[in-house]
UniProtKB/Swiss-Prot annotation:
Inhibited by UTP. It catalyses: UMP + ATP = UDP + ADP. Its main location: cytoplasm. Its EC number is 2.7.4.22. Catalyzes the reversible phosphorylation of UMP to UDP. It comes from Hyphomonas neptunium (strain ATCC 15444). SUPFAM superfamilies: Carbamate kinase-like. InterPro entries: AceGlu_kinase-like_sf, Asp/Glu/Uridylate_kinase, Uridylate_kinase, Uridylate_kinase_bac. It holds the Pfam family AA_kinase. It comes from the Bacteria. Homohexamer. This is Uridylate kinase. GO terms for biological process: 'de novo' CTP biosynthetic process; UDP biosynthetic process. The keyword GTP-binding does not apply.
């Protein structure tokens, strides 16, 4: 068992799903996978695992191909989404490699059967992997077009009985407006699912937020760029926004 297992009871969130965008893997680039950036994320995941957390991941594919963008350029949407799902498998395999280089046992499960390179998605097997301290990366969304990786992440978080869905982003939470465009924007400490949907705050797509609301699983939005931020979220500290049924006024 991990060396931090004795500290597990201090964690606010013990079993979590971490959602990363494909773009996050680009680092400072315009396309593809930046290995040093992946290594930074992997170190944060390894640190969280050592603290006793059980972690699964969903990674988008936008750094390689976005189905919506392909459809906008004239491709059939279902075909474009299938390409996007394949991009998420590439990202999952890259992250698996980086994690295993750090000594973190990792399994990739795909919603599309690719037996030569990863496991098929089997819910009970994924649960068992996590119980044994392995990191599980869910790839290929839910295996169907017209569903985003945000929705796939929400579904997997529910199926894995996660305590929270953690969304690692480029900003440190949810703001009243885009802080890059509006200097008066303020960050919410807590906010209700319904307010996210009503104000269309663009944290995740509406289907994902609705799934989280209906199953009463909190979403925590935080910046992965800050050292130790993932561990801080697991302990319920640091800078972030928590989305719950009740919500709260912004600070």
């Amino acid at each position: 068992m991990q060396s931090g297992a004795s500290e597990t009871n201090k964690l606010k969130y013990r079993r979590v799903l971490l959602k990363l965008s494909g773009e996050a893997l680009m680092g400072g680039g315009q396309f593809g996978i930046d290995i040093p950036t992946c290594e930074q994320f992997a170190r944060a995941i390894a640190e969280a695992r050592e603290a006793g957390a059980e972690i699964c991941l969903v990674i988008g594919g936008g750094n390689i191909f976005r189905g919506v963008a392909g459809a906008a350029k004239g491709m059939e949407r279902a075909q474009a989404d299938s390409m996007g799902m394949l991009a998420t498998v590439m990202n999952a395999l890259a992250m698996q490699s980086v994690l295993e280089n750090l000594g973190v046992p990792t399994r990739v499960q795909s919603a599309l059967n690719m037996d030569a390179i990863c496991e098929p998605y089997i819910r009970r097997r994924a649960h068992r992997h996590m119980e044994k301290g392995r990191v599980v990366i869910f790839a290929a969304g839910i295996g169907n077009p017209f569903f985003t990786t945000d929705t796939g992440a929400a579904l997997r978080a529910i199926e894995m009985n996660c305590d929270a869905l953690l969304k690692g982003t480029q900003v440190d939470g949810v703001y009243t407006a885009d802080p890059k465009l509006d200097a008066t924007a303020t960050r919410y400490h807590q906010v209700a699912y319904q307010e996210i949907l009503a104000k269309d705050l663009k944290v995740m797509d509406s289907s994902a937020v609705s799934l989280m609301r209906d199953n009463n699983i909190p979403i925590v939005v935080f910046s992965l760029k800050e050292e130790g931020s993932l561990l801080n979220v697991l302990y319920g500290r640091g800078t972030s926004t928590t989305i719950t049924k009740e919500g709260a006024e912004k600070p």
